[in-house]
């Protein structure tokens, strides 16, 4: 993990599920400290490492923490940090959830670009895990897998019974396509006929047509899309954020189909159990 940021930066916004407005401050830290959250609104300001062992829940978003101190919807920010090779960072949050912003990683990318990044010493840079044997996690017809590969690449497929999305596949090779243009702009998405049910369950309180793409069976309610295949690109963004809990992204070809945060984090745990 080769970089931290040059100066602190602050971003404000509303959490997707909590509906609570929070302030996030990213602060540079010394080499070797890693990426970690700090709930500055709670007594003793508890620290929550951005690490697999702290995964608490993975239903519709990824939540880290322990009883009394959690942080939710961390995946878009963490995807940005790992894509930029920012490995040492304190993330101060004054609420229970990282704000959704526009539903993509673009706002994080823009904010970090304004302050810039600086490299750590070469001695402190660790090497990524290299996958040598296939690993798979599956639930019914959904799966996510890691296969040996000479480079790191991602292939993701989705299949929804909604005409605007339907079947989509997308492959991303970080060496060939820039995260900032290919992945970061892809926004979270949802379905009009599920909104009321999710809100009754206490979820998506902060969701709106300003921070998420929404479709019904026939059309998008808030076009235009940033890519024709924006939904599957966003799923790949989520996968990247969940795999970041390993530290560096392993060298592998990651293949996912109809997967979820739960399957993503299960694969990350299987990789950790196998190679650490």
From Swiss-Prot:
Is Metal-binding tagged as a keyword? yes
Q: In which pathway does it act?
A: Glycolipid biosynthesis; lipid IV(A) biosynthesis; lipid IV(A) from (3R)-3-hydroxytetradecanoyl-[acyl-carrier-protein] and UDP-N-acetyl-alpha-D-glucosamine: step 2/6
Q: Name one GO biological process term.
A: lipid A biosynthetic process
**UniProt source species:** Synechocystis sp. (strain ATCC 27184 / PCC 6803 / Kazusa)
- The gene name on file is lpxC
- Kindly list the GO molecular function terms attached to this UniProt entry: metal ion binding; UDP-3-O-acyl-N-acetylglucosamine deacetylase activity
What does the organism's lineage look like at the top?
Bacteria, Bacillati, Cyanobacteriota, Cyanophyceae, Synechococcales
The cross-references to HAMAP family, in alphabetical order and at most eight, read: LpxC
Annotated residues that bind Zn(2+) are located at 76, 234, 238
Q: Which reactions does this protein catalyse?
A: a UDP-3-O-[(3R)-3-hydroxyacyl]-N-acetyl-alpha-D-glucosamine + H2O = a UDP-3-O-[(3R)-3-hydroxyacyl]-alpha-D-glucosamine + acetate
**Function recorded in the entry:** Catalyzes the hydrolysis of UDP-3-O-myristoyl-N-acetylglucosamine to form UDP-3-O-myristoylglucosamine and acetate, the committed step in lipid A biosynthesis.
The protein's name in its UniProt record: UDP-3-O-acyl-N-acetylglucosamine deacetylase
């Amino acid at each position: 993990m080769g970089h931290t940021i040059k100066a602190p930066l602050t971003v404000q916004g509303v959490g997707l599920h909590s509906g609570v407005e929070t302030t996030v401050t990213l602060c540079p830290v010394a080499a070797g400290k890693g990426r970690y959250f700090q709930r500055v609104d709670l007594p003793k300001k508890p620290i929550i490492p951005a690490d697999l062992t702290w995964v608490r829940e993975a239903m519709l978003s990824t939540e880290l923490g322990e009883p009394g101190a959690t942080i939710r919807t961390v995946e878009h920010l963490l995807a940005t940090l790992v894509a930029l090779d920012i490995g040492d960072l304190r993330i101060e949050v004054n609420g229970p959830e990282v704000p959704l912003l526009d539903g993509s990683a673009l706002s994080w990318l823009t904010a970090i670009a304004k302050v810039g990044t600086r490299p750590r010493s070469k001695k402190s840079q660790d090497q990524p895990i290299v996958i040598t044997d296939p690993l798979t996690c599956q639930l019914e017809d959904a799966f996510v897998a890691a296969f040996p590969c000479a480079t790191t690449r991602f292939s993701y497929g989705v299949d929804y019974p909604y005409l605007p999305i339907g079947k989509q596949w997308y492959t991303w090779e970080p060496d060939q396509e820039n995260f900032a243009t290919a992945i970061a702009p892809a926004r979270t998405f949802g379905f009009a006929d599920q909104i009321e049910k999710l809100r009754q369950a206490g979820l998506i309180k902060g969701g709106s047509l300003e921070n998420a793409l929404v479709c019904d069976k026939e059309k998008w309610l808030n076009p235009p899309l940033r890519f024709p295949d924006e939904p599957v690109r966003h799923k790949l963004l989520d996968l990247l954020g969940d795999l970041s809990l390993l530290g560096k992204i392993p060298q592998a070809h990651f293949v996912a189909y109809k997967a979820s945060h739960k399957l993503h984090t299960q694969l990350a745990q299987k990789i950790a159990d196998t190679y650490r």
